[in-house]
Curated annotation (Swiss-Prot):
InterPro entries: DmsD-type, TorD-like_sf, TorD/DmsD_chaperones
Regions crossing the membrane: none
GO biological process: protein maturation
Protein name: Uncharacterized protein HI_1543
Similarity-based family: Belongs to the TorD/DmsD family.
Organism in which the protein naturally occurs: Haemophilus influenzae (strain ATCC 51907 / DSM 11121 / KW20 / Rd)
Gene Ontology cellular component annotations, sorted alphabetically: cytoplasm
Length: 184
């Protein structure tokens, strides 16, 4: 993986983590949606694309009614949503995850039991940790086991293309980064 791809991994992980974590109408995401509609993701997406991933990129970057997307978000990820966002629901030990973060002096969070925090942690590690072992441990212990189950749920339950596309592209970037970590 080139240096550009690695840097883009951090950016994309942070973006995707926030898209899974925040309501689409959250003001924090306003600039992210503008950037997506300007095809910013296509400009930083360094992975090879096939027809399916091109369609997914387009689905994330098309102008969308944020209120409609907010309804989909509620249906999928709200407290009684169809997709469990809690990493503990996928067999991840939250206390072990919190300790992993503490050992690496990562910022404290109110609740670590959310899938999006795994993507945000991956981004933080990419930007702030020189430890290949830490990244490998994080992927093997926390991110990949949870992501496989969570993303499948999103793909199966989403009715709008946006979240199905987000799940597919998340899977692609994680697979590429996992392969890179395995090679090193």
């Amino acid at each position: 993986m080139s240096e550009k791809q690695i840097n883009n991994f951090s950016l994309i992980s942070r973006l995707f983590g926030n898209l899974f974590y925040r309501f689409p109408t959250d003001k924090v995401l306003a600039d992210a949606f503008v950037w997506l509609q300007q095809e910013g993701l296509s400009q930083v997406w360094a992975l090879d694309t096939d027809k399916e991933s091109e369609l997914a990129l387009n689905s994330l970057q098309v102008k969308i009614d944020l209120n409609l997307l907010n309804e989909e978000y509620q249906k999928l990820f709200a407290t009684n949503g169809k997709v469990m966002t809690a990493i503990s629901a996928y067999g991840i030990d939250v206390e072990e995850f919190v300790n992993f973060r503490l050992v690496r002096n990562m910022p404290e969070v109110e609740s670590a039991d959310h899938f999006a925090l795994l993507l945000l942690t991956a981004s933080w590690l990419e930007d702030n940790s020189d430890s290949l072992v830490a990244q490998q441990e994080f992927f093997e212990t926390f991110l990949l086991p949870c992501a496989a189950k969570f993303l499948t749920q999103v793909e199966n339950q989403a009715t709008l293309p946006f979240y199905r596309a987000l799940a597919l592209l998340t899977r692609e970037i994680l697979a590429t980064m996992a392969d890179e970590l395995e090679e090193e």
